[in-house]
């Protein structure tokens, strides 16, 4: 009888070890446990136990378990991309930025969200850079409606207005990554251009989130920069993608954004310098008062 019970237990353990749905959850939990920004809390320990005790009978159930656990380990910015999501993302025709040259030497740059491939990222940045003259009186960077994506093409697009110092830090549980313009250009694969020193107005709304909030923070603390509009979405944290079986990907929040001012941002909205329902008009008024 005892041998039979031991044999049954061994068979159950073998089945658990070979079940792809259970292994899917276990792999994701290991990733979250090691890297999640909130994966050192008692809430995470409870969520981890629940996830590991689950017995998903399908890939969809396993993914739902992982998605729920991810919100505890990484917070609201964490999400799971299925294979279908990945395919849709790869085939999406991403909107490119626009540049409008206004009277008085003002450039109005609109940066939409972007999650395309590296080739499209180069096109994204160069769409702006190729449209800019070498001298400007001022620039308006419109981040309204930009929900984020890959921050490097976005920053590369406006790098001419940033100083040659540490523009942003990404602070994880183990590291503090310091980012400067040179690093951004190398990652984006875009040639660096000469700086343009002029007043910079940034426009935000409640949809300005994630990577577009990172762009906002790149300019934070600069005496020639000012923000106008509404508080942002509150996703100023750094996400890292991790591959999972079946072509899916866990996009896990692993750290916080740190501005040059030393301020730390993560889940809270970023308030504008000027709260207004007419940000473009307010920005133009400020520019007119500050043009050299």
What are these model-derived regions, one by one?
Residues 28, 69, 109, 141, ...:
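Terminal peptide-recognition signature
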Residues 117-137:
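A short, well-ordered alpha-helical element
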């Amino acid at each position: 009888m005892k041998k039979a019970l031991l044999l049954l237990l061994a068979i159950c353990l073998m089945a658990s070890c070979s079940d792809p749905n259970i292994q899917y959850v276990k792999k994701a939990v290991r990733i979250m446990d090691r890297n999640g920004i909130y994966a050192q809390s008692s809430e995470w320990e409870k969520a981890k136990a629940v996830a590991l005790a689950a017995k998903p009978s399908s890939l969809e159930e396993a993914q739902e378990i992982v998605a729920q656990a991810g919100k505890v380990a990484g917070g609201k910015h964490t999400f799971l991309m299925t294979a279908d999501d990945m395919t849709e993302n790869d085939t999406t025709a991403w909107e490119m930025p626009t540049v409008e040259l206004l009277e008085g030497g003002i450039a109005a740059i609109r940066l939409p969200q972007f999650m395309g491939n590296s080739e499209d990222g180069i096109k994204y940045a160069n769409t702006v850079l190729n449209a800019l003259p070498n001298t400007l009186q001022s620039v308006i960077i419109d981040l309204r409606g930009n929900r984020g994506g890959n921050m490097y093409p976005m920053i590369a697009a406006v790098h001419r207005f940033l100083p040659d110092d540490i523009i942003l830090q990404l602070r994880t549980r183990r590291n503090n990554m310091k980012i400067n313009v040179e690093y951004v250009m190398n990652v984006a694969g875009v040639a660096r251009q000469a700086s343009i020193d002029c007043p910079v107005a940034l426009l935000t709304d409640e949809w300005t989130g994630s990577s577009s909030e990172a762009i906002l923070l790149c300019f934070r603390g600069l005496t020639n920069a000012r923000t106008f509009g509404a508080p942002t979405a509150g996703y100023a944290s750094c996400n890292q993608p991790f591959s999972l079986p079946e072509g899916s990907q866990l996009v896990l929040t692993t750290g916080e954004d740190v501005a040059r001012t030393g301020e730390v941002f993560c889940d809270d909205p970023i308030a504008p310098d000027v709260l207004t329902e007419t940000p473009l008009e307010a920005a133009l008024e400020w520019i007119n008062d500050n043009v050299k």
